[in-house]
Amino acid sequence: MNETTLRLLLERVRSGELAIDNAVNRLRELPFRDLGEAVLDSHRELRRGHPEVIYCAGKTVAQVRTIVAAMLEGEGDILATCATSEMAEAVAELSPDARYNPLGRTLVIRRRARPPTATFIAIVTAGTSDQPVAEEAAETALLFGNRVERINDVGVAGLHRLLARLELIREARAVIVVAGMEGALASVVAGLVARPVIAVPTSVGYGANFNGLSALLGMLTSCAGGVGVVNIDNGFGAACLASLINQP
């Protein structure tokens, strides 16, 4: 339930259109709903501006299906991250509107039309191998109502590729930079644009990359100001922060 839905509910009670007992039934499950194996945070959108997101890693197909089924009884959009194709198939049986992005491993059910923001979030990847994380960020940002511009494969090994897209990147309200290896792209971008840069280290790279640790440390020790760093492969977290910056 979001603020708009809550206001409409109260207006219906005030006008006599909705009986008080019916309104109480609608509100009874606030602020959470206990499903046994999971407890849905029904107030998440009211507090944060977006509904609870399902993190599928470690969950079974049956658990994801149960959670989605419960969320479908509400009115909000639904996003699941780190979802498998088997989970997507199970959810598709519940809703024909379910859309699966196999690259980003995201599952989206959009139930409310909202115009995208006039300003946009730029999502910049160092290499094609970083795109799964970037797609998770893009799908999250789009569902939260943001306009998104994807700028792929412009890493520091070919800096001219980045410079060719610099004008577009500078127009963004916030920039998400997704990079593995040594993670240098975040510092380079932050040195060229007057916008907040949200750096996402990825686990892409050979041995001494340590599954993203080298990129994480490189981004944390960036000499360029205005860089914020999220956890390794956390495209979702980067999109949440970028959305807060981009939304009016």
Spans of model-derived segments:
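Long amphipathic alpha-helical segments
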Residues: M1-A88, E93-L94
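Short glycine-rich or small-residue beta-strand-to-loop segments that form or flank ligand, phosphate
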Residues: V53-I54, I78, F120-A126, V175-V177, ...
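Short glycine/serine/threonine-rich phosphate/pyrophosphate-binding segments
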Residues: A62-V64, D130-E135, L159-H160, A179-V189, ...
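Glycine-rich oxoanion-binding loops at beta->alpha junctions
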Residues: T106-R110, R147-L168, L213-S214, V230
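Glycine-rich phosphate/diphosphate-binding loop of Rossmann-like nucleotide-binding domains
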Residues: A118-H160
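C-terminal binding/interaction regions
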Residues: T125, L166-E167, V204-P248
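Glycine-rich phosphate-binding loop
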Residues: A164-T202
